[in-house]
């Protein structure tokens, strides 16, 4: 899934003029990135397992029991706020002005909610923390790094986050749409 999300983000970047595809030259490093992009999330999953155990396995279903959409928004918002210190300590969103850091913090909220919809769907379908951990690793190490690599190696973190949000919107729309159709079918069968 992360490779597909990266492709959507790159398409959005190209369509909006954020990425001039004609000026881009595919080199050996790009080939290596593409070759390992599907393996990296799996290899990195143990690094993200602890975070997903806490957010997904422990917090998610306890936060707003029986209300998956409400718990998704609540967990996503808490998760986004949890990451707010990162631009101030040299991680994602660092290197710019204080305004850039604040904007990065605010943009993490919609990104975290969108990711939480996908994570919640994976968790609900699998009952395991591993698929969310794989997605989390892929989102950080394939989607974010890939956007930075292909769109503009010096791309501002907020550009990367905006493109990630744009790429996750259709994924979330498909998940929500499929859930609505499934629920309606279930109701129709029960009647």
Q: What label would you give each PLM region?
A:
Residues 3-11, 77-86, 137-147:
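Aromatic-anchored segments of alpha-helical transmembrane domains
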Residues 3, 38, 42-46, 73-80, ...:
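Residue-level signature of the transmembrane alpha-helical core
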Residues 8, 59, 115-119:
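Hydrophobic/aromatic residues in alpha-helical transmembrane segments
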Residues 24-40, 94-110, 158, 163:
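Juxtamembrane helix-entry segments on the extracytoplasmic side of multipass membrane proteins
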Residues 103, 135-191:
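C-terminal membrane module of polytopic membrane proteins
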Residues 59, 87-100:
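Membrane-interface interhelical connector segments
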Residues 1-11, 15, 22-35, 60-74:
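Interfacial transmembrane-helix boundary/kink motif in multi-pass membrane proteins
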Residues 50-81, 120, 124-128:
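Membrane-interface helix/loop boundary segments of multi-pass membrane proteins
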């Amino acid at each position: 899934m992360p490779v597909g999300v990266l492709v959507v983000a790159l398409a959005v970047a190209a369509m909006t003029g954020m990425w001039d595809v004609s000026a881009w030259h595919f080199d050996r490093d790009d080939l290596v990135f593409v070759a390992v992009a599907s393996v990296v999330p799996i290899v990195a999953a143990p690094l993200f397992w602890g975070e997903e155990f806490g957010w997904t396995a422990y917090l998610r279903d306890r936060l707003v029991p029986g209300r998956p959409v409400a718990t998704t928004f609540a967990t996503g918002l808490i998760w986004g706020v949890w990451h707010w210190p990162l631009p101030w300590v040299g991680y994602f969103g660092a290197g710019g002005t204080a305004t850039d850091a604040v904007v990065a913090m605010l943009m993490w909220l919609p990104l975290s909610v969108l990711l939480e919809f996908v994570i919640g769907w994976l968790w609900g379908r699998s009952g395991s923390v591993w698929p969310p951990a794989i997605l989390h690793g892929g989102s950080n190490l394939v989607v974010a790094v890939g956007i930075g690599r292909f769109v503009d190696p010096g791309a501002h973190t907020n550009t990367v986050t905006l493109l990630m949000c744009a790429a996750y919107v259709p994924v979330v729309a498909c998940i929500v749409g499929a859930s609505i159709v499934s629920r309606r079918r279930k109701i129709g069968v029960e009647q």
